[in-house]
Amino acid sequence: MDRAVSQVALENDEREAKNTWRLIFRIAILFLTVVTLAISVASLLYSMGASTPSDLVGIPTRISRAEEKITSTLGSNQDVVDRIYKQVALESPLALLKTETTIMNAITSLSYQINGAANNSGWGAPIHDPDYIGGIGKELIVDDASDVTSFYPSAFQEHLNFIPAPTTGSGCTRIPSFDMSATHYCYTHNVILSGCRDHSHSYQYLALGVLRTSATGRVFFSTLRSINLDDTQNRKSCSVSATPLGCDMLCSKVTETEEEDYNSAVPTRMAHGRLGFDGQYHEKDLDVTTLFGDWVANYPGVGGGSFIDSRVWFSVYGGLKPNSPSDTVQEGKYVIYKRYNDTCPDEQDYQIRMAKSSYKPGRFGGKRIQQAILSIKVSTSLGEDPVLTVPPNTVTLMGAEGRILTVGTSHFLYQRGSSYFSPALLYPMTVSNKTATLHSPYTFNAFTRPGSIPCQASARCPNPCVTGVYTDPYPLIFYRNHTLRGVFGTMLDGVQARLNPASAVFDSTSRSRITRVSSSSTKAAYTTSTCFKVVKTNKTYCLSIAEISNTLFGEFRIVPLLVEILKDDGVREARSG
């Protein structure tokens, strides 16, 4: 019995001893863990300089300051990022598109010529020097900020005269027409042998050429093909256009005076001709009885045409047959354009009555003088698919000479100020399905033309007139959104008489310093202007082809006046030598 109790007691002592050692072990482990943790914390505090609770209070402030610095840095770089985006996403693709357009135009022209060569119908293609690639038919000055009139023409520059002049005192060269494409230019004028007022016989000079740059860097126009159309056909009022097949020309054929033509009952004969790259001229009469069935007189606008969407577009004008469908649809329609800051004082009802009567001047027997646009498909067949567009007289003034221009992707119609409105007009034009639509015009108040009273240069009220002179403006300065800002042109700076030719840059209300041809008493007549850029030097030039009085050899001499467009804020006046 005692032995059994002793055995139990021994086992209990052993169990208690084991538990005691387990407790000691656990306490030792816990102590070592705490010591290790304390040492680790101490090491961390020492090595990292860890903040105390008081230090942690300032952390949000430091974070805010760092955030402000980062924001400031990003903000200063935003302008750079924006410029990079504009260059990469906007300007570079646009520049590539312009280059692509130029290349495609050249390829189109070459393809026409290759086909012509295959058919033994043409020679090789003339093309401007590489210095001009991308500088013809483009928006030459794109500037949102500068004053338009801070751009101005230099004195006239000496260059090669590519226009033949009269060789006798009775000779007469008149009515120049000019157009230039990305590959070549076209020029024509009328030649009369016995004085400028002879309507019975004349011949037409027609030339094709290219822009060259001389070894010294001068611009010159090089004529490569030309022809004198001296036959039994009396071509008048011719307009020319540079197309992929050469120089397309639209002319009327007349044997009577203008007044007699308007008093006739049938439309005027009209022909579509072409000077090809091989120097050969071909021509085809249009079916005017169908095309101009409602007209008693019809003439090209004299100014150059334009090649758009595989068609050549010309401005035309003339007289409508009374009570014909085309005449009836215009009945009661009119438009009144107003001078800048110079309102007509007449009563509104009287102004409307005068505006309506301005379309039927007495000089042409009371016929409605109408503006129109003729487009013809450009192909190896002449006169193909002609389409006539007659715009409403709620947009256009009385019909007059004009010009179709293409600059960049924009098209315009210039209308001569033959009616009461003296400032130069450029109607924006859109084309679709072979027809054209005209929109409210840009007006250039300081770009006036002389005229007979009551439609002189300073006129401000509607009146029936047939006056003025052809002096077209060329679109030169644009906003970045392609809106037109300013034009270049050579005006006749007289009130009533055709005197004082002067070149300038014009905005809607004013003009730059001017470059005069000579004295204020110099007689002149028609002027037509075209601008281009020498891309290599980034210099912009403008050519004004002007009829200048010539007392020794003929009444007029047609002179190609060349200027460079300069820029500053001066107001001096330049004069040619």
From Swiss-Prot:
Compartments it resides in: Virion membrane; Host cell membrane
Enzyme Commission number: 3.2.1.18
Disulphide bridges: 172-196, 186-247, 238-251, 344-461, 455-465, 531-542
Keyword Iron-sulfur: no
Keywords assigned by UniProt, alphabetized: Disulfide bond, Glycoprotein, Hemagglutinin, Host cell membrane, Host membrane, Host-virus interaction, Hydrolase, Membrane, Signal-anchor, Transmembrane, Transmembrane helix, Viral attachment to host cell, Viral envelope protein, Virion, Virus entry into host cell
Enzyme's top EC category: hydrolase
Catalysed reactions listed for this entry: Hydrolysis of alpha-(2->3)-, alpha-(2->6)-, alpha-(2->8)- glycosidic linkages of terminal sialic acid residues in oligosaccharides, glycoproteins, glycolipids, colominic acid and synthetic substrates
Residue numbers spanned by region Involved in neuraminidase activity: 234-239
Glycosylation sites: 119, 341, 433, 481, 538
Region (Important for interaction with fusion/F protein): 124-152
Topology of this chain in the membrane: Single-pass type II membrane protein
GO cellular component, one term: virion membrane
GO MF term list: exo-alpha-sialidase activity; host cell surface receptor binding
Major site of localization recorded for this protein: virion
Keyword Membrane tagged: yes
Superkingdom: Viruses
GO biological process, one term: virion attachment to host cell
Signal peptide: none
Regions of this protein lying in the Intravirion compartment: 1-26
Membrane-crossing segments per the record: 27-47
UniProt similarity note: Belongs to the paramyxoviruses hemagglutinin-neuraminidase family.
Free-text note on domains in this protein's UniProt record: The C-terminus (head domain) is involved in binding the cellular receptor.
Record's subunit section: Homotetramer; composed of disulfide-linked homodimers. Interacts with F protein trimer. Interacts with host CG-1B; this interaction inhibits viral adsorption and replication rather than internalization.
Protein name stated in the entry: Hemagglutinin-neuraminidase
Species whose genome carries this gene: Newcastle disease virus (strain Chicken/United States/LaSota/46) (NDV)
